[in-house]
């Protein structure tokens, strides 16, 4: 593989995470405006965003098999066509059914692109370098989570319709589409070059189960937490602007943490540092949930920084449970994380309705504690050390 080709594929991976980050995180910013647009209460509007998460979940799950049937370049180019259709649907339809369908399509495109992006990184890089590359890739999710809410706020403050926010997000996919030209992708399945070596049946092991539970609980905990921080902060007497700043600070700190840990992780055993970070994140979230408004800004900055490497390290360790990185295994762990995304409002909505936003934040805290337990148990069964030793010889 040429260096310029590797750079193009790496940038496709970066932008695939930026696309998903923008779509998922911008939801909270535009939900109120979309509810007004359709004359619906915000609570029932949040349910329609489940279509976005369902699209992401289904496409990541199915793409574990589709990658071996449909070439990656074809998938990305077809995704561009779907993206144009979905954004056009949002702009020109006033029907809630069409809005839900467009959200589902956006989810499908996002899920396919993100699973391809993750696979490309696990395919091109090995060992600890894979972990730091995946972490840097994931930082684009946070970067988009910081940039696109600012773009949304800029547009909405000037009474520009909410669907232009999605048109701006579509520009990320335009960049991905342009990068596919003159770029060679790894061939998989029936398109892969034939070898005489027999294909070894891979055994995943119980470590994959622990990592999958950790992925689900981490994403559900993180999004359950960050989705209700503004409501919780407003309940404590903070202004909407200050509450929004808390969320922006979290993602900014998260992004800085990813850049820092993409360097730091090279010097540590991944399972051990993951356990330490998961424990720290659970403690810092508890400090935020039980602290005073004066300390909230500092505790959310610390939480963002120390939790930034958790999800990517879970995926990296998942890919290292077999000798050869398996798209099915990586996609399985990703799917579990996406189930967490999909369950965000399903789980936290009723909790907030009955017990208020703080109860949702404490539930998220409990989920982070589960992540810590799973990471600790992984230490007894993980195969990443033996596979790293094999690849280094």
From Swiss-Prot:
GO cellular component: plasma membrane
SUPFAM superfamilies named among the record's database cross-references: MFS general substrate transporter (SSF103473)
Pfam families given in the database record: MFS_1 (PF07690)
InterPro entries in alphabetical order: MFS, MFS_dom, MFS_trans_sf, MFS_TsgA, MFS_TsgA-like
Chief location: membrane
Domain of life: Bacteria
UniProt keyword tRNA processing, yes or no: no
Membrane topology reported for the UniProt record: Multi-pass membrane protein
The UniProt record lists the keyword Cell inner membrane: yes
Signal peptide: none
Recorded GO MF terms: transmembrane transporter activity
Entry-linked CDD domains: MFS_FucP_MFSD4_like
Keywords noted in UniProt: Cell inner membrane, Cell membrane, Membrane, Transmembrane, Transmembrane helix
Transmembrane segments: 11-31, 51-71, 78-98, 101-121, 134-154, 162-182, 206-226, 245-265, 273-293, 297-317, 332-352, 361-381
Family in the record: Belongs to the major facilitator superfamily. TsgA family.
Protein name listed in UniProt: Protein TsgA
Name of encoding gene: tsgA
């Amino acid at each position: 593989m040429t260096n310029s080709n590797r750079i193009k594929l790496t940038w496709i991976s970066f932008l695939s995470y930026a696309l998903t980050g923008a779509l998922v995180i911008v939801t909270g910013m535009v939900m109120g405006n979309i509810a007004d647009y359709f004359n619906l209460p915000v609570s029932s509007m949040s349910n329609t965003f489940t279509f976005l998460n369902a699209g992401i979940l289904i496409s990541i799950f199915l793409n574990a098999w589709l990658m071996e049937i449909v070439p990656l370049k074809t998938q990305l180019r077809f995704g561009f066509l779907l993206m144009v259709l979905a954004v056009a649907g949002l702009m020109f339809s006033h029907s809630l059914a069409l809005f839900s369908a467009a959200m589902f399509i956006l989810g499908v495109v996002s899920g396919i692109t993100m699973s391809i992006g993750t696979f490309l990184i696990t395919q091109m890089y090995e060992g600890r370098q894979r972990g730091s590359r995946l972490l840097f890739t994931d930082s684009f999710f946070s970067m988009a989570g910081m940039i696109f809410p600012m773009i949304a706020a800029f547009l909405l403050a000037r009474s520009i319709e909410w669907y232009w926010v999605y048109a701006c997000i579509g520009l990320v996919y335009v960049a991905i589409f342009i990068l596919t030209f003159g770029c060679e992708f790894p061939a998989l399945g029936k398109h892969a070059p034939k070898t005489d070596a027999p294909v070894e049946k891979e055994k995943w092991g119980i470590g994959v189960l622990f990592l999958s539970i950790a992925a689900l609980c981490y994403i559900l905990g993180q999004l359950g937490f960050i989705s209700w921080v503004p409501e919780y902060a407003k309940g404590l007497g903070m202004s909407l602007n200050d509450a929004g700043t808390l969320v922006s600070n979290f993602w900014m700190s998260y992004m800085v943490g990813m850049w820092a840990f993409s360097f730091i992780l090279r010097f540590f055993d991944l399972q051990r540092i993951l356990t330490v970070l998961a424990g720290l994140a659970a403690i810092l979230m508890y400090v935020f949930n039980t602290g005073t408004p004066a300390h909230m800004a500092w505790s959310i900055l610390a939480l963002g920084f120390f939790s930034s490497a958790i999800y990517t390290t879970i995926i990296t360790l998942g890919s290292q449970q077999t000798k050869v990185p398996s798209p099915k295994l990586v996609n399985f762990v990703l799917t579990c994380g996406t189930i967490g995304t999909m369950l965000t409002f399903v789980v936290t909505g009723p909790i907030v309705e009955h017990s208020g936003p703080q109860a949702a934040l404490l539930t998220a805290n409990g989920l982070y504690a589960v992540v810590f337990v799973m990471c600790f148990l992984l230490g007894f069964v993980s195969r990443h050390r033996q596979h790293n030793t094999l690849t280094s010889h």
